[in-house]
């Protein structure tokens, strides 16, 4: 409850917004981006840690996207082939590094602390420091970089759909299986969530319920959206149109 109240106070206090405007990036501890062992999350010191950063970035993002879209209205699309390849390569390498880092740390801590480490939190705190939470923070930072996806799409004059990560041509055969894997991922996360709730209620360990509720609300929203996309794109009613598109491309 104290955390919720502090967030509300932070958002409604005009002085906090004034401090954010005056805040210089040189005041941030940028070493935290490359120091997982000594990582500790500190509001106002850890880069991009202010509550107001999110709405400000989103406003800039939306203004930028729709401005570019307006300017590109009567222009030819940019190819951006090399930039797209480089951007996707960076995302792949970044994701691989995060995956390896998280798996290594989880395996090490489960070996030392037992499997309940993955479910129960330390009631005395500690969720804001350490290697495990460093990778959570790096994942958060990656979301800012991923906003470039939409910029590239708009510059290439590709259609902007809600799930714009799937903006590529629907006739590419492997896209269907990627979507299926994504849906399976969200189903597995949902099952893990049920097991999580069962475990914490059975043994009575501490967990942060607001964070848990927020995380799984997002998970189920993605499950709904990806399932809707799959049904719309790959159900039999669209098979004829997809076949026609493929045949036209072959011709």
Curated annotation (Swiss-Prot):
UniProt-listed Pfam families: ELO (PF01151)
Keywords, comma-separated and alphabetical: Fatty acid biosynthesis, Fatty acid metabolism, Lipid biosynthesis, Lipid metabolism, Membrane, Transferase, Transmembrane, Transmembrane helix
Domain of life according to the entry: Eukaryota
Localization per Swiss-Prot or TrEMBL: Membrane
Root EC class: transferase
Its biological purpose: Could be implicated in synthesis of very long chain fatty acids.
Protein name according to UniProt: Putative fatty acid elongase DDB_G0274669
Provenance organism: Dictyostelium discoideum
């Amino acid at each position: 409850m104290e955390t919720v109240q502090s967030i509300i106070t932070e958002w409604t206090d005009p002085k906090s917004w004034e401090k954010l405007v005056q805040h210089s990036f040189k005041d941030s501890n940028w070493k935290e981006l490359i120091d997982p062992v000594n990582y500790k999350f500190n509001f106002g010191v850890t880069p991009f840690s202010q509550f107001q950063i999110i709405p400000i970035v989103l406003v800039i993002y939306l203004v930028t996207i729709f401005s570019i879209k307006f300017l590109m209205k009567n222009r030819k699309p940019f190819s951006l082939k090399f930039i797209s390849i480089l951007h996707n390569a960076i995302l792949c390498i970044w994701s691989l590094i995060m995956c390896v880092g998280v798996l290594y740390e989880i395996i090490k801590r489960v070996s030392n602390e037992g499997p309940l480490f993955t479910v129960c939190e330390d009631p005395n705190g500690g969720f804001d420091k350490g290697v495990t939470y460093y990778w959570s923070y790096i994942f958060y930072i990656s979301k800012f970089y991923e906003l470039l996806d939409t910029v590239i799409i708009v510059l290439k004059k590709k259609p902007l759909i809600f799930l714009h990560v799937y903006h590529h041509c629907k006739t590419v055969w492997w896209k269907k299986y990627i979507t299926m894997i994504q849906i399976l991922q969200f189903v597995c996360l949902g099952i893990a969530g049920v097991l999580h709730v069962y475990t914490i209620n059975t043994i009575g360990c501490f967990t942060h319920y607001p964070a848990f509720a927020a995380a799984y609300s997002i998970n189920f929203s993605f499950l709904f959206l990806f399932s809707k996309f799959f049904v719309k794109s790959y159900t039999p009613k669209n098979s004829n149109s997809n076949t026609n598109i493929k045949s036209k491309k072959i011709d």
